Amino acid sequence: DYGKNWRAALSIHHSGNDLVENITYEDIRVEESDEAFLCMGYFFVPQYYYDGDTPPLGVVMRNITFKNVTYNGKKKAPSYLYNVMRQTIGGVREGEGTYYDKSNPDYKITMENIVFDNVKYQGTKIDSLDKAKECGFMIEPEVDVKFK
């Protein structure tokens, strides 16, 4: 249900043409979440643009660090890192990956240098993409994510 994915204990939701950069979440402990643990995404909502249908060009989120962040909850709380999420009637659904219009690669929307430094999920240290997936992290392949 993509309608709920954007509600998370820690999240960054971006829609527009500005760059979101140099953000650090540090020394945070989440005891429980009824929704997701982490969520980052770019929301493409056409009415936010003057011409009605032009997404931003280039990197929109970069240099985001999650350092010493822990989820201790007993409930499963997935995490989502989406390059594009589109608003639809009744909620939000995952977009088409990095490119809004795959026939026009100039419309590139990306996340770069997303760092997980000592992030733990229910006791498991997230130090690789495989570990992240095992813990319910849904990360688009185009997202530039690093693990420490």
Summary of predicted features, one role per range:
Residues 1-148:
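Extracellular parallel beta-helix/beta-solenoid repeat domains
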